[in-house]
């Protein structure tokens, strides 16, 4: 049985329109351990590269899912000995690095699962808005209200028996995150 994170990724992947190029960066085997002994292994900048050829937009996407009401993140000002959180320092910094390029949209995709009632809510947030939230909140976690307050955009989804289908065609065609260049 797949873990919920891989199942969310699989549902997200199945929701991508056929005319988009989607590439999953391969995780190293050490990426699945929680040990600090693997600090010298390759760390992917994000989970996916997605290209919308019709609009000429390249997305760098990091997907996160949780059953909790919040998502934790590591502080970028601290060294790598800090306790591990759901969003890692290198993921934040990598997405920030990609944001300097024209037509490149580095984003987080956040999925909140209410497992007791079988409902999921998913949002996409541009890294620039994430950084405003990061600096604006006086805590090392955020919830859905925080996300919405910092311009995260909800992705419409439908549950099909067990798995979700996310309407990414409509989402990508109607959102540009008002990226400042």
Tell me what each language-model feature is.
Residues 48-50, 57-68:
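Conserved catalytic cores of phosphodiester-cleaving nucleases, focusing on short active-site segments
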Residues 30-32, 68-72, 114-117:
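Short, solvent-exposed loop/turn segments at secondary-structure junctions
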Residues 4-22, 125-181:
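Helix-rich interaction surfaces within compact, conserved domain-sized segments
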Residues 93-131:
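Nucleic-acid nuclease catalytic cores
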Residues 63-85:
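Short beta-strand-loop-alpha-helix junction that forms the active-site gateway
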Residues 1-42, 53-54:
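Acidic-basic catalytic patches of nuclease active cores, encompassing PD-(D/E)XK
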Residues 41-45, 56-60, 90, 101-103:
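Short connector loops at helix/strand junctions that flank enzyme active sites
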Residues 24, 60, 107-110:
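A structural signal for short, well-ordered beta-strand segments and their strand-loop junctions
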């Amino acid at each position: 049985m797949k873990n919920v994170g891989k199942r969310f990724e699989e549902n997200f992947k199945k929701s991508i329109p056929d005319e988009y190029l989607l590439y999953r960066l391969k995780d190293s085997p050490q990426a699945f351990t929680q040990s600090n002994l693997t600090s010298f292994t390759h760390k992917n900048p994000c989970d996916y590269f997605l290209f919308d050829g019709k609009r000429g937009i390249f997305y760098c996407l990091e997907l996160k899912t949780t059953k909790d009401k919040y998502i934790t993140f590591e502080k970028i000002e601290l060294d790598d000995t800090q306790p591990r959180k759901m969003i890692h320092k290198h993921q934040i910094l990598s997405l920030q690095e990609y944001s300097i390029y024209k037509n490149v949209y580095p984003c987080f995709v956040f999925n909140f699962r209410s497992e007791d009632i079988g409902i999921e809510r998913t949002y996409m947030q541009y890294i620039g808005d994430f950084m405003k939230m990061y600096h604006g909140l006086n805590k090392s976690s955020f919830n859905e209200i925080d996300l919405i307050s910092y311009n995260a955009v909800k992705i419409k989804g439908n549950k099909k028996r067990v798995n979700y289908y996310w309407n990414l065609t409509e989402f990508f065609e109607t959102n540009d995150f008002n990226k400042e260049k």
